[in-house]
Amino acid sequence: MLKHILLVSLLSFSTLPLLKAQSCGNDEKYHLPYKNTYVKEPLVTENEYRVAKPETIVPKSFEEARQILPNPIWGGHDKELEMYWKAWEIAIGNIRAPQAGSGFVSSYLDTAYNGNIFMWDSSFILMFARYGTRFFPFQNTLNNFYAKQHPDGFICREIKADGADCFERYDPVSTGPNLMPWCEMVYFHQFGDTERLHKIFPVLCAYYKWLKLNHTWRNGTYWSSGWGTGMDNMPRVPSEYSPIYSHGHMIWLDTNL
């Protein structure tokens, strides 16, 4: 009788549909063998960017931009002014539209050398690009990171143009440092965009909670790695550790800031 019950149970189980792990953006591209280990963060359900439709904005020409962008007046400094306008010309030339199927939701400023978007580079360049907001909504560059947030709050620091994360989330180089709130606060202080603040708040809170859970030591300080901080050319770990890939069992000051 017991054998019969077990046999029926096994046959019934085999007819059930297989549960597919929630995608993290890489599954179909790289056929990752990982099991679903997500502990879902409720704040992620408030992330509107994960379900937003892509919005492509085609920028105007650089000649048109010169009529809109801040026009500095600095007598006797023609070379400096030439550099200023050249910086804007380069920036405008690097505006990209989201690829179809990438999961990106906004046209963005591409700051990298390889076609990927970088959390570190994007956050800092937007502190400059915000002065061109009347010409183009550069701040929306960060929307693409928010759109690729994982169910547990993680956001990869480097994402390919096709939307695929470059690193598994528990890799020591996978994310950080947490510069996006700083970038958003600078933007808010200048423009007072409360609507954007309300939208990004749960996203950034969920990411902060993930970092606090997964990138801190027992005393509450944070760790990172050379690539994780964007400072792989500033070796600081003991010689037995990789200056690029390892946390070196150290407290990383720039990650704690």
Language-model segments: which ranges?
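A structural signal for well-ordered alpha-helical segments within the folded catalytic domains
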Residues: 85, 123, 136-139, 143, ...
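Short glycine/serine- and small hydrophobic-enriched flexible loop segments
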Residues: 127-131, 182-189
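The substrate-binding groove and active-site-proximal loops of carbohydrate-active enzymes
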Residues: 119-120, 124, 163-171, 188-198
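Alpha-helical support elements that line or immediately flank enzyme active sites
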Residues: 115-149
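Bacterial Sec-dependent N-terminal signal peptides
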Residues: 1-22
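Low-complexity, Ser/Thr/Pro/Gly-enriched N-terminal "stalk/linker" regions
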Residues: 22-117, 140
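The feature captures the catalytic groove of carbohydrate-active enzymes
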Residues: 26-54, 111, 152-179, 212-257
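Active-site acid/base region of carbohydrate-active enzymes
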Residues: 68-89, 132, 145, 150-154, ...
